[in-house]
Design a protein with these regions (language model features):
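Conserved S-adenosyl-L-methionine
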Residues: 2, 8, 12-67
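SAM-dependent nucleic-acid methyltransferase catalytic core
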Residues: 7-12, 53-156, 160-166, 179, ...
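Short, solvent-exposed loop/turn segments at secondary-structure boundaries
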Residues: 167-171
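Charged helix-capping and loop-helix junction motifs
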Residues: 172-178
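Conserved beta-strand signature within the Rossmann-like core of class I S-adenosyl-L-methionine
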Residues: 189-194
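Binuclear metal-ion centers of metallo-dependent hydrolases, dominated by the metallo-beta-lactamase
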Residues: 196-202
Length: 202
């Protein structure tokens, strides 16, 4: 799916890409664009990208003294008063959990634990080289789209799926989806919407 998204963006001819529900940032990390706007309401995700951009070396240094263990995974669910520490814990949990949800420790007898830590370091380096040029926002989708809409803008939207409960930290109401559709019908730029198909969406 990622390759399809990137191809649609390339064919749009737009120079600015806005990831409205940014999540992991995978789309922006792989898109070739002059301007990249990342947005997510999840404070943990936004804080992670901002912290890596400002204090990459501090995060990498912590990985040098970190083990891959279930005990540490459980301990890292606790919130501290240190923002850098909380960002690190969030990243650690997501890299070592099922489906990146940060909730359940993913253990495999085939996994080389030291390789996992190395992979985490590589992910930080990859993120940093790209996100240092991002604009990072934490806005409601309506405010974000209105702020960045232009003829040169491409919006990618992968919102919480309709009528799927308990999977997302922030869910949308039926009215939210209705207003999203109305807003997208009026924008100057182009958009790609990735959403599940059900009777309401149709």
């Amino acid at each position: 799916m990622l390759n399809d998204i990137l191809e649609i963006f390339r064919n749009s001819g737009k120079k600015t890409i806005v990831d409205v529900f940014g999540g992991s940032g995978k789309v922006l990390l792989n898109a070739e664009a002059k301007v990249k706007i990342y947005n997510d309401l999840n404070a943990d995700v936004v804080d992670f990208f901002e912290e890596v951009r400002k204090n990459k070396e501090s995060v990498l240094e912590k990985l040098n003294y970190t083990l891959n263990s279930r005990e540490l995974f459980t301990r890292y669910k606790e919130i501290t008063d240190d923002k850098t520490e909380n960002v690190f814990r969030y990243f650690y949990r997501n890299m070592l959990s099922f489906n990146g949800d940060g909730k359940s420790y993913s253990y495999s007898s085939r996994r080389n634990k030291s390789t996992t830590i190395t992979r985490m370091k590589e992910a930080i380096d990859t993120c940093y080289n790209d996100i240092k040029s991002w604009t990072i926002e934490r806005l409601d989708f309506r405010d974000l789209i209105r702020r960045y809409d232009s003829e040169g803008t491409f919006f990618y939207l992968d919102p919480p799926y309709h009528n799927i409960k308990g999977l997302y930290e922030y869910e949308l109401t039926d009215q939210d989806y209705i207003e999203m559709k109305a807003l997208l019908d009026e924008i100057k730029g182009k958009y790609l919407l990735n959403i599940n198909e059900d009777e309401f969406v149709r």
